[in-house]
Structures are given as structure tokens and as C-alpha cells.
């Protein structure tokens, strides 16, 4: 009797070459159903339909196709077991030797935020996981393939005989496949049925192993959902991404998205913006008339720190922008797109990592912010709620003028992306000084004001948290700051407001804190 391979896949990439090799080179009978069977038949391969094999027609609009003893008995039977052999003979069930199954695209379906409940439910696979689990359980006798990237390795092994080690590895990957699938379903349903945290975090597949972690002695790996967030990024050139690259890219992208992100239509950037990041903190941020102008201003904000930095741009990179990018050493650049001439210019920097990240991939990513602690993880919403200046209050006697209001809004967009304690000095849509990560707020203010230097006069200052004392505001006033924005809420707010009034500064309270740890 010819060996049997059962093929039923949602992702049909590589299925025809696999089936051709199984049938023509290794003598397998091909058993299939639905769309997979049609693809194989259209390729000229002889296929036995599952309905023909079982003698039972597909029912319930295709919901029941493979859930049948003649399928599962063939998968689960242990070769050489006398009782199993008797059952197979009595019920005329031929053994199935290879199971090639991947599941309905549930994760991809629910990546669309507008997906209906009914559509999502119809993309929950039932028969597929049952076959995968059955084959994985009986891996001593059945090889189970759940991903196209396994096909070539399996065919090479098949020529010499599939050993126990490969069968076990394939079984492990199969159980990982179904486990991740079930977690994705429960996570999605939980998010929509309750405001509370889901009982389980979503399973995220391995994308690639990284050279090392934050330091060379640390092992590291990158897990990412396909086509979601950074999983949808295309690396156009440059060296392999590192752990630190990815952390900095995430920080840069989050900051530049404050000003919109995209190249056209509804995804056109609101303001052309550029962000330069070092060690997850923005060291230069600016808006401009065109991406090239924004980049030049962002680099000018702190060219010393920009060396070896990560750049995020929120619009199409043209030749002028590309020339600016090649003017100094940078690690990575991310943008929604690159013009052909820009690609040619940037190609002269062979080690520069270029990433193209479409707005759609960002939209498809979840909003959970996840951090690890010893023995567990912490999950919170992203701090990405839209900023609404109409909800702010003026606490000082003097109100900010229109120019100051624009600067305060810009600085407030930026400060929530700086590590706490965070202080930002800015003017005319450009950061002038950033104070990050100090253990006291006035220390961060000193750093930001020193970096701004003489440019602090007439600029604004933003703080991610309230002022516990009036020392920060007094320091700002002595450096010529004209307006301050902060959450408010300190028992000593009145002291800081009084200093503003004494020096003629405007103070705006947002009522919202933006700590970043």
C-alpha cells in the first residue's frame, strides 16, 4: 500500500512543490480537501478528496470535513500495535504517514480592528488543530508539518528516512503552533468581552535569534507577530538588527508618531517630523516644512549626541533627506517609505540599517505595553492617548500667547517619550535640551537647560511629573524660560505658580502625568 500524505493548509505557499515531491519522488498518495485539493488538482496532481476517503460528504458549509474516524484513526494508529492493527483492518482504515496542516488565519483576520465578531469566529479552525494534535501525539509514526519553512528540511530527511529526533522536533513545533493559536483566540475574545486584563497573554512567535542582548555576554531573541508592528517591517539594507537597535527604534518610532505617520491619504503625516534617539531617549526632535527640513533641525538640536543614533522619520525619504542622513554616522533609519534615488544615496552607507515600516503594520499591532519582572510580566496600556490642549488649565496670572502655546504643545508631545524624571526645553518646533532619567527633577532640569544654553531664553519647559518644590521653576526662570507645562497635583503647586507669577512666566497644568520607566 502506498504511504498517504494528508494536506490541508490555509497558507498554500510551497504546497504544490511539496506535494509533487511526495507523490512523484516518494510514491505518496495525496489526500486533501477544500481549497488545498483544488490547488493540487489544478497543478495536475492526482488527489483523493477527504469526502471520498471517508465516504461522508462535507457538511455545515465546510465546518465538518476531516472530523471522521477514517481520518483520525489513520493518524493516531500506532504501527505494530496488535490491537490497533486489528481496528484498522476491521474498519478498513489506511494509516496516514504525513500530515501537512496549517490553520485558518485567525490572527491575521483579527488584526483588522474593524473585523466583526462573526467573521472572527468563522476563522477559528476546528478540524485543523485536531489533526495537528493527533499527528503530533503519534509522532513516532506520523510526521507533522505546520509551516512552509519546514518543507525542504523534511523532504531532504525523507530521502534517507525521517529519524526520531526530527519527528520530535516537528511534534514540538506543532504543539507550539496550536497552543499559540488557542491563546490568540482567547486573548482576542477576552479583550472584547471585558475591560479587565485577559487571563492569558497572547503567544508571540520567534522571528529571529539576535547576535546578543544589550551586552555581548547576554543571549537574546526577537519574538514578533507576522505583519504586526515591527514584524511587518522590511529591512532594505544594512547589518543584522541588534537588541539595542530594536529598543531604540521602538522609542524613536513612538516619538515621531506624535506628529502623524505615513505618506498619503488618511495616513499622511500631520506635521513633517524627525526624531533622533540614543539609548531610548530622544536627543533631537523637530518638525519642519518637509522631512528634510525636519531632519536637519533634529540633528542640529544635538549633533554630538546624534552620532551613532537612531533616526525615525514620519514621511517619504527623498534624495535631499538621504544626503542629510549620510552626513554623519547613524545606526538605523526607519520611515514609511524611501524614494529610489534616496535608496541609491543611502546604499553608499552599506552598514546603515534601513527599515521601511508601513502605517498598516503599526495599526495592526496590539496596544499592550509589556515589561518583565522576576518570574512574571507587567502589562499596561500604551501611553499613547491623543493630546487635547483644550483640557489644559492656565495656573499663572499670565496666559501663554499663541506662539508659546504651540511650543508647549510640542514639548508636551515630546516629554512623555523621555525617561523619568523628564524635562524638555523647546522652541519653534525644535528640542533644545533634554534632561532624562535623573533621580530628582531639578537635576534633569539642569541637564536640559545646560544643553539648551543661551537658546533657553524665550523657550518653554515641559516636565513629565509635577514639581515637588519650586526649585525647578526658579531655575527655569533664571535661564530665561518663558512658559512651563506640567501635570500639576503637588501639595506645593502654589509655590511653583508663585515663582512663575514673580518672573512673569506662564504655567499650564495638563492634569495628566507621563512617567516613563
UniProtKB/Swiss-Prot annotation:
GO cellular component: cytosol
Gene3D superfamilies: 3.40.140.20, Methylglyoxal synthase-like domain
EC number: 2.1.2.3, 3.5.4.10
Example of a GO MF term: phosphoribosylaminoimidazolecarboxamide formyltransferase activity
Catalytic activity from the UniProt record: (6R)-10-formyltetrahydrofolate + 5-amino-1-(5-phospho-beta-D-ribosyl)imidazole-4-carboxamide = 5-formamido-1-(5-phospho-D-ribosyl)imidazole-4-carboxamide + (6S)-5,6,7,8-tetrahydrofolate; IMP + H2O = 5-formamido-1-(5-phospho-D-ribosyl)imidazole-4-carboxamide
The MGS-like domain, residue ranges: 1-146
Keyword line: Hydrolase, Multifunctional enzyme, Purine biosynthesis, Transferase
CDD domains named in the record: IMPCH (cd01421)
SUPFAM superfamilies, per the entry: Cytidine deaminase-like, Methylglyoxal synthase-like
Superkingdom of the source species: Bacteria
Database matches in SMART domains: AICARFT_IMPCHas, MGS
GO biological process, one term: 'de novo' IMP biosynthetic process
Pathway: Purine metabolism; IMP biosynthesis via de novo pathway; 5-formamido-1-(5-phospho-D-ribosyl)imidazole-4-carboxamide from 5-amino-1-(5-phospho-D-ribosyl)imidazole-4-carboxamide (10-formyl THF route): step 1/1; Purine metabolism; IMP biosynthesis via de novo pathway; IMP from 5-formamido-1-(5-phospho-D-ribosyl)imidazole-4-carboxamide: step 1/1
Pfam families named among the record's database cross-references: AICARFT_IMPCHas, MGS
InterPro entries recorded: AICAR_Tfase_dup_dom_sf, Cytidine_deaminase-like, MGS-like_dom, MGS-like_dom_sf, PurH-like
Assigned protein family: Belongs to the PurH family.
PANTHER family referenced in this protein's UniProt entry, alphabetically: BIFUNCTIONAL PURINE BIOSYNTHESIS PROTEIN ATIC, BIFUNCTIONAL PURINE BIOSYNTHESIS PROTEIN PURH
Domain notes: The IMP cyclohydrolase activity resides in the N-terminal region.
Protein name per Swiss-Prot or TrEMBL: Bifunctional purine biosynthesis protein PurH
Organism annotation: Prochlorococcus marinus (strain MIT 9313)
Lineage: Bacteria, Bacillati, Cyanobacteriota, Cyanophyceae, Synechococcales
Gene behind the chain: purH
Amino acid at each position: 500500500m502506498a504511504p498517504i500524505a494528508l494536506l490541508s493548509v490555509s497558507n498554500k505557499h510551497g504546497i504544490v512543490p511539496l506535494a509533487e515531491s511526495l507523490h512523484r519522488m516518494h510514491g505518496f498518495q495525496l489526500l486533501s480537501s477544500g481549497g488545498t485539493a483544488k490547488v493540487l488538482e489544478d497543478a495536475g496532481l492526482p488527489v483523493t478528496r477527504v469526502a471520498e476517503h471517508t465516504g461522508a460528504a462535507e457538511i455545515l458549509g465546510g465546518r465538518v470535513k476531516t472530523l471522521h474516524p477514517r481520518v483520525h484513526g489513520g493518524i493516531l494508529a500506532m504501527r505494530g500495535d496488535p490491537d490497533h492493527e486489528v481496528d484498522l483492518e476491521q474498519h478498513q482504515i489506511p494509516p496516514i504517514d504525513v500530515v501537512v496542516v496549517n490553520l485558518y488565519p485567525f490572527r491575521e483576520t483579527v488584526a483588522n480592528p474593524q473585523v466583526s465578531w462573526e467573521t472572527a469566529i468563522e476563522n477559528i479552525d476546528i478540524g485543523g488543530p485536531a489533526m495537528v494534535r493527533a499527528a503530533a501525539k503519534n509522532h513516532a509514526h506520523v510526521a507533522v508539518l505546520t509551516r512552509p519553512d519546514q518543507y525542504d528540511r523534511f523532504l531532504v530527511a525523507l530521502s534517507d528516512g525521517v529519524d526520531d529526533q526530527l519527528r520530535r522536533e516537528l511534534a514540538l513545533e506543532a504543539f507550539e503552533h496550536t497552543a499559540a493559536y488557542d491563546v490568540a483566540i482567547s486573548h482576542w475574545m477576552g479583550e472584547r468581552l471585558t475591560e479587565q486584563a485577559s487571563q492569558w497573554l497572547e503567544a508571540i512567535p520567534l522571528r529571529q535569534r539576535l547576535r546578543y542582548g544589550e551586552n555581548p555576554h547576554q543571549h537574546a531573541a526577537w519574538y514578533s507577530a507576522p505583519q504586526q508592528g515591527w514584524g511587518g517591517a522590511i529591512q532594505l539594507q544594512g547589518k543584522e538588527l541588534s537588541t539595542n537597535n530594536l529598543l531604540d527604534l521602538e522609542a524613536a518610532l513612538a516619538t515621531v508618531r506624535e506628529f502623524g505617520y505615513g505618506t498619503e491619504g488618511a495616513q499622511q503625516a500631520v506635521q513633517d517630523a524627525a526624531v533622533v534617539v540614543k539609548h531610548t531617549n530622544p536627543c533631537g526632535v523637530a518638525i519642519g516644512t518637509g522631512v528634510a527640513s525636519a531632519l536637519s533641525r533634529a540633528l542640529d538640536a544635538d549633533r554630538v549626541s546624534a552620532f551613532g543614533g537612531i533616526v525615525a522619520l514620519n514621511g517619504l525619504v527623498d534624495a535631499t533627506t538621504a544626503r542629510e542622513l549620510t552626513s554623519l554616522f547613524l545606526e538605523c533609519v526607519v520611515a514609511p517609505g524611501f524614494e529610489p534615488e534616496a535608496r541609491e544615496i543611502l546604499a553608499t552607507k552599506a552598514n546603515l540599517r534601513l527599515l521601511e515600516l508601513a502605517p498598516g503594520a503599526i495599526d495592526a499591532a496590539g496596544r499592550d505595553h509589556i515589561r518583565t519582572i522576576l518570574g512574571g510580566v507587567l502589562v499596561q496600556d500604551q501611553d499613547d492617548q491623543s493630546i487635547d490642549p483644550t483640557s489644559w488649565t492656565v495656573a499663572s496670572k499670565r496666559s501663554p500667547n499663541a506662539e508659546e502655546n504651540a511650543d508647549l504643545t510640542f514639548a508636551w508631545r515630546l516629554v512623555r517619550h523621555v525617561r523619568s524624571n523628564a524635562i524638555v526645553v523647546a522652541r519653534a518646533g525644535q528640542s533644545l535640551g533634554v534632561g532624562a532619567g535623573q533621580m530628582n527633577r531639578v537635576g534633569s532640569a539642569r541637564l536640559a537647560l545646560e544643553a539648551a544654553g543661551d537658546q533657553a531664553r524665550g523657550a518653554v519647559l515641559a516636565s513629565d511629573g509635577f514639581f515637588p518644590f519650586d526649585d525647578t521653576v526658579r531655575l527655569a526662570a533664571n535661564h530665561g524660560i518663558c512658559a512651563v507645562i506640567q501635570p500639576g497635583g503637588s501639595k506645593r503647586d502654589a509655590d511653583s505658580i508663585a515663582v512663575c507669577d514673580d518672573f512673569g512666566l506662564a504655567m499650564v497644568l495638563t492634569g495628566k502625568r507621563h512617567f516613563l520607566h
